[in-house]
Each structure stands twice: as C-alpha cells, then as structure tokens.
Amino acid sequence: MKILLSGFCLLSFLSLSAQDSLTILFAGDAMMHQKQLDNTRRGDFFDLGSYFANIEREVKSADIAVVNFEVPLGGEPYSGYPAFSAPEDFALALQKAGFDFFLLANNHCLDRRTRGFVRTIQALDSLGIRHTGTFLDCDHRHRTYPMLLRKKDFRIIMLNYTYGTNGLKVDIPRIINYIDKEIMKGDIAEAKLFNPDFIIANMHWGLEYERIPSREQRELADWLLRQGVDLVIGSHPHVVQPMELRRGKEGVTDRLVVYSLGNFISNMSREHTDGGVMVKVVLGRKGLRRYIVSAQYSLIYSSRYKNEQGKEDIRVVPAASWLGKNQNSSFSVDSALIKY
C-alpha cells in the first residue's frame, strides 16, 4: 500500500494537566460492500467481531472517536455498492470498537431513499450513538445543530457537510447538510455563540481516487479557517490526501487540515483504497489560549484472510504490522503511530 503524505509534525508547547487536554481520533470512510455482507452473515446476524479488534485499544484511548459512517441502515434486503444498506450490527461493531460519534452527511445517505434515511437516524438514536449531518426536520436540526460535545470540560462543536447525494434529492421535511457557504457561514456564527473551545468541520468533498486535494478543497478549507473553524477533516476520495498544520496568532499552531482520511474499512480493491489513516489530535488550553498540543496519524490497512467458515473476511490492522507480515499475530497499533 503506497501512501504519500506531506510533512506532519508532532507539537508540544506547554505542560498540561489531564483536564487541560482533550484527545480526538478521526477515522475515514466506514463502508460495507456486498462481499462483506455475504461473508459475515450468520443467519439473522452478522459476525463482525474481528473487524476492529486490532485497533480497538487505540480508538478507545481517545476521549472522542469520530468515524464517517458512509452507509445507511436501510433495513433488508441488505446490499453493497451502488445503493448501500448495512445491518445495525455494523454500527454496533464500530460502537464496540470505541467510536462514539458518527458523521452522516455523505453521498450515500440517500441510497435507500427517505425510508433508509429516517431509519438510520432512528437506529443510531436507539443504540445511543451520537451523530450529525442529517436531520428528520427543521426542528430536529435546530435542536441538535451545530452539534455541541462536552467532554472533560471542553466544549467542541462538530459540523458536517457533503458535496452531494449522487443526484438524489431529499424529501421535505428531511434535511441534509450540503456544502453551501451561506448556510455554513450562518452555522459557524451560531456555533460561536456556544463559546466553544474548538470548532471542527467534517467535510465530505473532493474527487474520488485523487491523492492530491483539488483547488476547490484547498480554497474551501482556507475559507472555513477564515470563518473561525479550527480543524477541517475530509472524507470521500477513498484515498489518503495531505495534511497541514497551520500557525495562527503569535506563531502558535492552532489549526489543522486533513484533506482526506482515506478508507477506514471497505471491500474496495482499487489501488490506494485498501487503507487509510486514523488521525489523533490532542487539543490543549492554557488560560485563554487554545491550540494543538500534538497531531499524529496511524496508517491502517484492510487485511483480508479466511475466516472459520473458509470465507474471505476483513480486519483493520496497523499498516506497520501488515508490512511486517504479522497478519496472524496480535497487533499493537502503537508501533504504527508515526511522529515527526
């Protein structure tokens, strides 16, 4: 798996107490293709126990773990690309692995039309999984967006937008957060009223399979930062794109742009789509200062193997372990964390 990344620095400015720092982990596109459905089905449930076992410790080490949930929970018949519908077992497996915040604004959220759209929101609510990006109606959006997360006395705003929904239109009164500068500008202004420590914009954007961000991505990232966003985290291209740390006032590094995290888990086999990165960011505060204490990424890979039924199965592993040909051993993701 060949991945090219721009320089990504580990930063540390001030000593912090535990309550003065917050760790957030971001993972890319979580998808369930037809082969995954066929090979993990066990009667009326899906056995996904091996999917995330090798990276679970790393995910759970974060205070907040975020994933781009790029499949609707549309009910049966379950299906893969091009019109996804995944079982609740997929969401449960991610939750068990430590992911507690799902992003829903993506180009597949209408794959099962209005019924699947509504069912996804209701299913995640019933599982106790927080999410944003799609809404049942205006009242639902007004009550829950901008999404404010409170953790360790930090106040984090989570925003989420998509470039489109594969030509499908959402039925009134349902709402999807599309990329629209006027709407986003209003959302960011409203977010500031919460007096957040950090504002994070999760963007489903860019061109599939392109390993360099487009001009539109770069311009939009710059625009978001100018509006007051602190972290811009991208998804959709299914491949990893460069990451940038930005310095703000007084030379303090307080902003981060990740153009694309790549795939977290899928059955895609096109070059560079069989893996991605998990990005872990430690956010800090000291008095009135808000800044990035450290930023690091872990390369991950969707490793294929034969399960107990003799069918091809998938598990997410640290790329360093995979490259070391230790696929059948217990992995420590710490060995794959790359710090500069």
Model regions and ranges:
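Bacterial Sec-dependent N-terminal signal peptides
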Residues: 1-19
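Acidic, metal/ion-coordinating pockets
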Residues: 19-340
